Amino acid sequence: MITMSVITLAICLWAILSTRKLEERPGKAQNVAEKIVEMLLNFLTGIIGRDNARDFLPFLGTMFLFIVISNYSGILPLAGRVPGLAAPTSSLSITGALAVCTFLYTHYVGIRNHGRHYIQHFTKPVIFMLPILLMEAFIRPMSRTLRLYGIIYGEEAVTMEIASLAPALAPLALHALSLLLGFVQAMVFVMLSCVYITEAAGEAH
């Protein structure tokens, strides 16, 4: 998908260019990057605490930026009308890939922190719980996939339909709604990911 490739490349280039020459007195690019990182760190700190926020910031921060920019790309003039230019998060395969990445990272953190004891917790309190706990582990990312996909796809479809009925008045109000929904959905996705990753990292396992 063209939009996804452009967004991914833009995030990578921004990260490289803004951190290439770090200085005591930051320039504009470094200053913007530091403000964004600080904002994301404070957001995560409010959910999972400072230590966990610092540990998981690279993954969760990148996830948040990708999702929110992808959501916002849906308000571009040709989005949804030209093949390859739809918002990436309106594609089930993309939202599924995001959920799979979170799923893998969650269990990586669990194994990193607890080793074989993390694997063993799927059999507690009794081994008969194994199928239920495995189903829960797979259902969690699936639910996030469907939630993000459904809302962004539905929002794009409704926006295009209403805009065609009232092209002079609808766009501004609908774009404002799209901006709000895009940000909220990125926050919800990352907040749920925070909960699952922190559970895997916690001492309960």
Outline where the language-model segments fall.
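Selective transmembrane helix interface/packing segments
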Residues: 1-205
